[in-house]
Amino acid sequence: MRSAIIDIGYNAIRAVVYECDRLGAPEIFNDKFKSDIINLLNLDDLEVKHQVYLSLQYFVHIFDRLSVTDVKCVATAVLRGHPRAEEFREIVKRKFNINIEIISGNREAYLTAAGLISGINDACGIAADLGGGSLELAQIKDKKVGILKSLPLGTSLITNNHFDDINIISQMINKEFGEVYSNHSGIQQCQQGYHCPNLYLIGGALRLIGRSYMEFVHYPLKNLHNLEINRREFELYLEKLAHAHSMRTQYKSRIHSNAILVAKSMLNVFLPEKVIISNYGLKEGVRFACLPKEEQEKDIIYERTKTLVNFDETTYNIKNYTEVIKPILIQPDTTTISIITLVIMLAQYNKNIDKTLRSNFIVEFILASDIPFSHRQRLMLSIALALTYTTRSDTYINRLAKRMINSYDYCNSHIIGNFIKIAREIDGPRFQSPSFSLELKDNRYIEISTLNILPKAVFEKVCERLKAIGFARKIFIEIK
């Protein structure tokens, strides 16, 4: 059953269609149009030909062609409290049979936070969604949403309300959200601010700043979602962005000066350790809230990957293979363990691909995929998956990884990739049950025991992979 979400915002109308009501279902349509809905609402007669109606008509046409059975439409600050909002709703209902739900500011903040949680499973900190008509703030921790606040600090409203001063904006954020956040979280305000762990930037205006930052620093990956920036580095960049008129980036002319003001104000008030950009926000939150409870509790990365490769959990025994590799990993954390699972799943994604090009294909896919991997996961997966198809890891990815992830992750990625190759050589492509075990001797040697004696050719391949694992561990020890 295909479902669609429409988000009517201050500056744009967005729509997305999902294949079904599972968390791992892929998007099969995603588009947006600029919207001057304020101009429409200011007309004497709302029943005129207008781009807003043409956009909605187009979406309805696409929904019909895709056999969409359920449409959820929400409108935010652009209609919230507007005297002609009800008249507009009635026209849209009559013309397109779409029911527009005009959500409150707090509801918008909640749904934005829910969307963030669906896309970043371990999100912790403050979600900030900046639109044309408002700024929504939400506290997030342990997949739960805490304090919610909607402030009249949208990029289009700041100038109209004469709020275009960093001190005014900072004071408003602190008074309306910061003080409540301090009381609720137990984090006491110091002279500088509150020191929240992460500040998640959502909304087109803030994402554009993130994209511009990536270009400015020549960030090697292209994925905006889950981009992590040190607070101090981001502060310095915002200063350059605000004052350096000669700065050359393709996004500079499109960045709203009020978005820079709001971003700087939030950094002043919350003092986050990191700034993280998220592509997941209101639309995703509306969908997430409509999903069954059991779907909401799942991990979107695992579910999206499972759907991609048509992974049958009853056929594979990933847990047992994970136990086999654990003794040879170097201080693995939960992310490292999750990489093992994802590599085994993605290693099945090789049908109808030239076997001599599988390594190139899978690396490029991981780097380009819209599955919401963290950048750390993308690099670890790329190294490990390249090794499952070739005897050497991808040179380009190796160079990136050495710059962007720590030595633990770099070495563990090599260990995982070579281990998966060993498992395939011994047990075949389906990881049903391990017929071998590994033991680390004196923290130097790796001993393998197999259920059956291996043919010489297979044994030699396994030994080469064990040597590669030993070399990765040796390099790590030398680095340390």
Regions found by a protein language model. Give the residues of each.
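Short, surface-exposed alpha-helical segments at coil->helix boundaries
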Residues: 82-89, 260, 463
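A structural motif specific to WD40 beta-propellers
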Residues: 28, 146-148
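N-terminal glycine/serine-rich phosphate-binding loop of ATP-dependent small-molecule kinases
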Residues: 1-4, 8-76, 85-99
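Divalent metal-dependent phosphate-bond-processing catalytic cores, especially two-metal-ion Mg2+/Mn2+ enzymes
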Residues: 327-331, 399-480
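Helical "lid/coupling" subdomains associated with nucleotide-phosphate turnover
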Residues: 17, 38-62, 81-82, 99-118, ...
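A structural preference for short, hydrophobic beta-strand core positions in alpha/beta folds
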Residues: 73, 102, 277, 477-479
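A short acidic Gly-Thr/Ser loop motif
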Residues: 7-12, 128-134, 202-205
